[in-house]
Amino acid sequence: MEIISVIVIGGLVLVAIVATLYMVPLRLWIAAQASGAGVSMLTLIAMRLRRVPPDQIVNARISAVKAGLEEVSVDMLEAHYLARGRVEAVVNALISAGKAGMELDFSRAAAIDLAGRNVLEAVAMSVNPRVIETPKVSAVAKDGIQLLAIARVTVRANIDRLVGGAGEQTVLARVGEGVVSTIGSADDYKHVLENPDTISKNVLKKGLDAGTAFEILSIDIADVDVGSNIGAKLQTEQAEADKQVAQAKAESRRALAVAQEQEMKAKTQEMRAKLVEAESTIPLAVAEALRTGKLGVMDYYNMRNVIADTEMRQGIAGTTGGKPDPAGES
């Protein structure tokens, strides 16, 4: 029984030692004390209980102290970690800003980091400006010639406007808009080719970095190419459209004329039918006149001679408009 008791006590002591070593990272505590970071044993145990990795917080605190950032406390680092921030990136950004002589405190750096910005990259861009290139921008001068331009924009991160400021895409879009506006206001495309710096000057005057997280230092036109003659194409397309409209109107007038012609032909046939109908009553009228004595025989033959003479004259003139003898049908 005594042996079993000794084994149980030894096991409990071993478990207690392992738990103590887990709860109290001696290596980190020793490193913090050696570097003057001033992290107590209770603080390390509290980090374990709050599920905060002590090594990340302690290493960041040691880096800050060694860089002279004594104001960055363990509580500030731990609070930033619990807010899902990147502690190491914030501390490295503070160190870089301090070495570069920039004014950047922990609260602002933490706010930039929590806003989703890369605070370390922002500090690096503030020290070393970066060049971003626009895609090929197409614009048309007043003479109708298309120009394709590529601009290189040198920007520097503005720490004060990183939170809530627009990003690179906004800067590129504004620069492209300025390039299009400048080329579009040029009377001659040759003037733009001869003086590409006019584009840079006009674009810089517009203050395109307002409301963005960057400060535009310079805009340089890297390349300008001549595209197609857009003005001529538009005129050609307009002429073709006018031609089609004119053809449509002419076709409409032709169809209207054909319809009117057919209508007149129908009316002519109708009048001829009425004429034939009227002429069919002439023999009956002549017979009735002869029977009643209102028309003499000599008068009838005189009328026949006139009709025959008229038909002969029309035949000689080439106009066969003569009608058959209406009296002969009776």
Swiss-Prot record:
The chain crosses the membrane at residues 3-23, 26-46. One of its GO terms (molecular function) is nucleotide binding. Keywords: Cell membrane, Membrane, Transmembrane, Transmembrane helix. It is a multi-pass membrane protein. Coiled coil: none annotated. Its main location: membrane. It is found in: Cell membrane; Membrane raft. Pfam families: FloA (PF12127). SUPFAM superfamilies: tRNA-binding arm (SSF46589). GO terms for cellular component: membrane raft; plasma membrane. Signal peptide: none annotated. Found in functional membrane microdomains (FMM) that may be equivalent to eukaryotic membrane rafts. FMMs are highly dynamic and increase in number as cells age. Flotillins are thought to be important factors in membrane fluidity. Homooligomerizes. Belongs to the flotillin-like FloA family. This is Flotillin-like protein FloA. The lineage of its organism: Bacteria, Pseudomonadati, Myxococcota, Polyangia, Polyangiales.
